[in-house]
Structure formats: structure tokens, C-alpha cells
């Protein structure tokens, strides 16, 4: 008999000296009439012990702290051996919560347990966005979190409706996912399973063999993220009119059309020599470099005390640097930089194939373009979650919670734990091709380029650039979509900028448009880490390095659970 599944949520107090759950709600996924809303954590945990089901909280890192705190204060201890009256957790070294498994005992060989998962890992969006994007017949409401609610507080009709909506939105969305066969712990795992189902597990294991941990560690040194760069020429200055273009599904488009690695790599010494059987390669290289005049910098060196990890470098400084580079990255670097004192050390070479992901991407692109609401959003999730799964870190050493003397939770690093890599070379080359796509487009617009962010280019002026004029389309895979045209803008650093965007009213909503069609402008604030509350205080006049405001919630572990303390946000 399959286990029941429930969407759950807590509402909690906001005082450091009075941290507790003042309301809970649960609703059965697939049976929305089976729900309850109450005002006692003890009552909820009694139900948890009796129900022995799978529960989903949206942001388990927050709600889970109250559950683990309760377990510790009621005689349960952490254990990964499945003993009675223990609980196990999956919490990453970075503090990401995935699961709490509470064991109450055994009936014969059957484990009596309730497992609690994070729905945010399956649906990585705010509840409000899920309701809107999935076109669900209800919306997330609002309540005042800071209202005094003493122990035993009777839930008001407004609060009741708010909690019910929250748990119902997630229950409906998860039900749709599960009915599509998307039943793994994370969106990435769902996507990888979907790909294996199309390819077959047997073929997957042949095409993407398990590499040893030492080899994976070496190859992983060539793995880098998206290209995010601000042109110094425009830094901290108000700019006039400009345009933004985004690649439609950047990573899936690279997976669809680029040559990508497969099979067991071959190690080579020295400089890679052309090999038609193994045309893709990762080269370990030591060199000094100087940026050529008129070129965008593309070299970024992390975990090195001599360089800022987020800065793209114009030269190598006083010492040669050692990097692991795909042939895609190396060719870009050779075009953009003068290289000196080059030493080719060794590397890995790979067979290549184009179209490994064609059937998978065709399937979900069809759904994305022919469906609306939930199915469309799930298709986008499937398309965008696969590439990163290939480069999952095999070091899964986690954190273990414990109760400190003051009644708050502490976390220690658990025993070292490793899993098999998936196939890191794939993640390495997909991201390399993605950077290549963005950087080559930006370089071709060198006299206009303001900013790049992974899949987008921001340009001065309002003419479509020559390099992309034949591949501009709002939907086609790998084409550039004209995202917006702005009247003025200001960029401070990576992921920190404001724009007045040209818009017109369509069916009561503001839509981006050309300057000729515009009836007004919409003020847009993009700033990593800045809350919507603080964004409302931003203007062109005060948007600068050093801007400071209260309104950033900082989680603090206290006796009973977690309190979000209002703290200062500063643009540095």
C-alpha cells in the first residue's frame, strides 16, 4: 500500500525570547478535503507519529528547525542507523535541508516512520509564483507576521484562510508533479530520471561510465558557472537608452546542438594533439596572460588569495597561473588574451556526439510550447534542471544537528561521505558552450556591451545588433529573445542594477515594448540579496555602493526553532 503524502506549513512567532509555532496546517496531496489547521506543535507532532506518511514543507530549512528542536527536546536522538526513537537528516555542508526521517520503531520488519521533505527542492519558486504560474484556482494571501499571538491563540478566519491557501497551493502543485511521474526528492533528480527513461538506464551507464573519484576531482577543476560581467566603462554611471536580450533556454540549447563528451576519457601528457576519435579535451595549462585591446576579459580564478573570485582578469599579475580548461574555453582565451610562458602539462580527451539529449529536449519543448499553466512550468523545470545534475558533487558529507545548552540547534560536520559521480565532463562542457554563446555575442557588440549575466546581454542603443538579428525570436530554442528596452539604467556590480523599462498597457497589465509604442516606464530593481521591501526604497538618486537599509531577514537559531531577525542590507 502506497504511503499517504501531505503538504504542511507552520506559522511561527517572531520574538527571540518567545520562539514557537502558533499555527500548523496539513492537507493530503490528492485528497484536498483531508486537511487540518491547528495551533499546537505538540498536537502536530502527535499526528506525525501516528500518520507515518511523507510530508512536504516549502522551505524545510525553516520549518524543519522547529521539528528537530522538538524531537531533541522530547528524547529523540540523531542516528543514521534507523533505530527506534531516532531521526536522520540530509542537510548539506552548505546548510541546505533535504529530508528528516523520524523512526518510531518496527512492526516485524516494517519500519514505522514519517519522512519529511522539502517541496522547495521540487518546486524551486515562492508559493505565490507557483499559484500564478501553475494557474491554480487560488492565490497566496498575506498576514501580519508580527501581530501578538500568545500561547493558545485562537486562529482568526483570515489566518485560517491564509494557512489553508498555502498548504493547498503546494498540495495541488505536487499532485500534478506526482501524476506526471516526477516523484524524486529534487527537480534535478526528476529530470535525470526522465532522461534515463528515454535513453534507458543500460545505455546511460554505457554512454556515461562511472569515473573514479580522483579522476572526477581533476575534471571538476574545469567546471565553471555562467559568465556574469559588468563593463567598467559603465560601472556606477547613469546610462541612457539600451536593450536586453536573453537566450531562450540557454543550457538546453547547448545540450541540443553542441558536440558534447561521452565515454571514458583518455589521459594525455603535455599539449593535446589533434585526435579525430577524441576531439574534445580538457587541458591543464600553466601560463601568464594579458588582455588584448578591445576584448572582453574571460578568465576568472577562484579560491586563490591573489585574485577576487568574482573578478574577470586583465592580466595574471606577477606569477603564472595554472588552470584546467576545456578546448572551448581555451580557444576563447587564446582569442581574447596574449599568452606568455605557456606550459602544457596534461589533460583528458573525450569522444564527442551531438544530439544525445535531442529526444528528451524535443519531448519537453513540445509540452512547454503546447501547454499552459502547470504542465508548461513543469516542462521548463525538466529542461533546466538536467545539466547541473551531471556535475553533482560526489562529496555528500553533510551536517548533523544537535541541541546546544541554550536550547537552540547547533550543527557539526558529519562523517565523510561520498557517492558515485554522475558524469562531470558533461556538466563541464555544457557550461563551457553556454559561456561561449554569451561571450561571443557580447564581443561582437563590444562597442555597445554594458553587462552580461549567464544567458543575457545588455546593450546601449535601441538597434538590434547585426550578430543576432537573424536569430531573434521570443520562443525558438537557442534564439535570442528581446527581453526589454530601457529608457535609462544604472549598473553597480554583477547582479546589481536598475532600469526604467519602456512599457505599454495590454489587458490591464504592463508589457515591455519598444520606445515608439510605450505609454510609460516601469522601474525595475535587480539586486542579489535585496528583499522586495528594500527594493521599494530604491531610486536612481540613492542607488549606489554604500546604500543601506533595514529589512533583510536574518535567520537566528534560538530555543524552540528559528526567528527571522530584521537586519541591515548594504550594497558593497
Swiss-Prot record:
Q: Which InterPro entries does the entry mention?
A: DNA-dir_DNA_pol_B, DNA-dir_DNA_pol_B_CS, DNA-dir_DNA_pol_B_mt/vir, DNA-dir_DNA_polB_phi29_vir, DNA/RNA_pol_sf, DNA_pol_palm_dom_sf, RNaseH-like_sf, RNaseH_sf
UniProt-annotated site: Involved in binding template-primer structures, residues: 90
Report the EC code(s) recorded for this entry: 2.7.7.7, 3.1.11.-
Positions of Mg(2+) 1 binding: 142, 166
What Gene Ontology molecular function terms does this protein carry? DNA binding; DNA-directed DNA polymerase activity; exonuclease activity; metal ion binding; nucleoside binding; nucleotide binding
Q: Site positions for Essential for 3'-5' exonucleolysis, renumbered to this chain?
A: 9, 11, 62, 119-120
Binding of Mg(2+) 2 occurs at 246-247, 453, 455
Mind telling me which residues the site (Stabilizes the primer-terminus at the polymerization active site and contributes to the coordination between the exonuclease and polymerazation activities) is annotated on? 526
Instruction: List UniProt keywords, sorted A-Z.
Output: DNA replication, DNA-binding, DNA-directed DNA polymerase, Early protein, Exonuclease, Hydrolase, Magnesium, Metal-binding, Nuclease, Nucleotide-binding, Nucleotidyltransferase, Transferase, Viral DNA replication
Q: Which SMART domains match?
A: POLBc (SM00486)
Sequence segments annotated as region (DNA-binding) = 223-226
Can the keyword NAD be found in this entry's annotation?
no
**Any domain commentary?**
The N-terminus contains the 3'-5' exonuclease activity and strand displacement ability. The C-terminus contains the protein-primed initiation, DNA polymerization and pyrophosphorolytic activities.
Question: What family is this protein classified in?
Answer: Belongs to the DNA polymerase type-B family.
Query: What protein is this chain from?
Result: DNA polymerase
Q: Which species is this record about? A: Bacillus phage Nf
Q: Which gene encodes it?
A: 2
Amino acid at each position: 500500500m502506497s504511503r499517504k503524502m501531505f503538504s504542511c506549513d507552520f506559522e511561527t512567532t517572531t520574538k527571540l525570547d518567545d520562539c514557537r509555532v502558533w499555527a500548523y496546517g496539513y492537507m493530503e496531496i490528492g485528497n484536498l478535503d483531508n486537511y487540518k489547521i491547528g495551533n499546537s506543535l505538540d498536537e502536530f507532532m502527535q499526528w506525525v507519529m501516528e500518520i507515518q506518511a511523507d510530508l512536504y514543507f516549502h522551505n524545510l530549512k525553516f520549518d524543519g528547525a522547529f521539528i528537530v528542536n522538538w524531537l531533541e527536546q522530547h528524547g529523540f536522538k540523531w542516528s543514521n542507523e534507523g533505530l527506534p526513537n531516532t531521526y536522520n537528516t540530509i542537510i548539506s555542508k552548505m546548510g541546505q535541508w533535504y529530508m528528516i526521517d523520524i523512526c518510531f520503531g518496527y512492526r516485524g520488519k516494517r519500519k514505522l516512520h514519517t519522512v519529511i521533505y522539502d517541496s522547495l527542492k521540487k518546486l524551486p519558486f515562492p508559493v505565490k509564483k507557483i499559484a500564478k504560474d501553475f494557474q491554480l484556482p487560488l492565490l497566496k494571501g498575506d498576514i501580519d507576521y508580527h501581530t501578538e499571538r500568545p500561547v493558545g491563540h485562537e486562529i482568526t478566519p483570515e489566518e485560517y484562510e491564509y494557512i489553508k491557501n498555502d498548504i493547498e497551493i503546494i498540495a495541488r502543485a505536487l499532485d500534478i508533479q506526482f501524476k506526471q511521474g516526477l516523484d524524486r526528492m529534487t527537480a534535478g533528480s526528476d529530470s535525470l530520471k526522465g532522461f534515463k527513461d528515454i535513453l534507458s538506464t543500460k545505455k546511460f551507464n554505457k554512454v556515461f561510465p562511472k569515473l573514479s573519484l580522483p579522476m572526477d576531482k581533476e575534471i571538476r577543476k574545469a567546471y565553471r558557472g555562467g559568465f556574469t560581467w559588468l563593463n567598467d566603462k559603465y560601472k556606477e554611471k547613469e546610462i541612457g537608452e539600451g536593450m536586453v536580450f536573453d537566450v531562450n533556454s540557454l543550457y538546453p540549447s547547448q545540450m541540443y546542438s553542441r558536440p558534447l563528451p561521452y565515454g571514458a576519457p583518455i589521459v594525455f601528457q603535455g599539449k593535446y594533439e589533434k585526435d579525430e576519435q577524441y576531439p574534445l579535451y580538457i587541458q591543464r595549462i600553466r601560463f601568464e596572460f594579458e588582455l588584448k585591446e578591445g576584448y572582453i576579459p574571460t578568465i576568472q580564478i577562484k579560491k586563490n588569495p591573489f585574485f577576487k573570485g568574482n573578478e574577470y582578469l586583465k592580466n595574471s599579475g606577477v606569477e603564472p597561473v595554472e588552470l584546467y580548461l576545456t578546448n572551448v574555453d581555451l580557444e576563447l582565451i587564446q582569442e581574447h588574451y596574449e599568452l606568455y610562458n605557456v606550459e602544457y602539462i596534461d589533460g583528458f580527451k573525450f569522444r564527442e556526439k551531438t544530439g544525445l539529449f535531442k529526444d528528451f529536449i524535443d519531448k519537453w519543448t513540445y509540452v512547454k510550447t503546447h501547454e499552459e499553466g502547470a504542465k508548461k512550468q513543469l516542462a521548463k523545470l525538466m529542461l533546466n534542471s538536467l545539466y547541473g545534475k551531471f556535475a553533482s558533487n560526489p562529496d555528500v558529507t553533510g551536517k548533523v544537528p544537535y541541541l546546544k545548552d541554550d536550547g537552540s540547534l547547533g550543527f557539526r560536520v558529519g562523517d565523510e561521505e561520498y557517492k558515485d559521480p554522475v558524469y562531470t565532463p558533461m556538466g563541464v562542457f555544457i557550461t563551457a558552450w553556454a559561456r561561449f554563446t554569451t561571450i561571443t555575442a557580447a564581443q561582437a557588440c563590444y562597442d555597445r556591451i554594458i553587462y552580461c549575466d549567464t544567458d543575457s546581454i545588455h546593450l546601449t542603443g535601441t538597434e538590434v545588433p547585426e550578430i543576432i538579428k537573424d536569430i531573434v525570436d521570443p520562443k525558438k530554442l537557442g534564439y535570442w529573445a528581446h527581453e526589454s528596452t530601457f529608457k535609462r539604467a544604472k549598473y553597480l556590480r554583477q547582479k546589481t542594477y536598475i532600469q526604467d523599462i519602456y512599457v505599454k498597457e495590454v489587458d490591464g497589465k504592463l508589457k515591455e515594448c519598444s520606445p515608439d509604442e510605450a505609454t510609460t516606464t516601469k522601474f525595475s530593481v535587480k539586486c542579489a540579496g535585496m528583499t522586495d521591501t528594500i527594493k521599494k526604497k530604491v531610486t536612481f538618486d540613492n542607488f549606489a555602493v554604500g546604500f543601506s537599509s533595514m529589512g533583510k531577514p536574518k535567520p537566528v537559531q534560538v530555543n524552540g526553532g528559528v526567528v527571522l531577525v530584521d537586519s541591515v542590507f548594504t550594497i558593497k
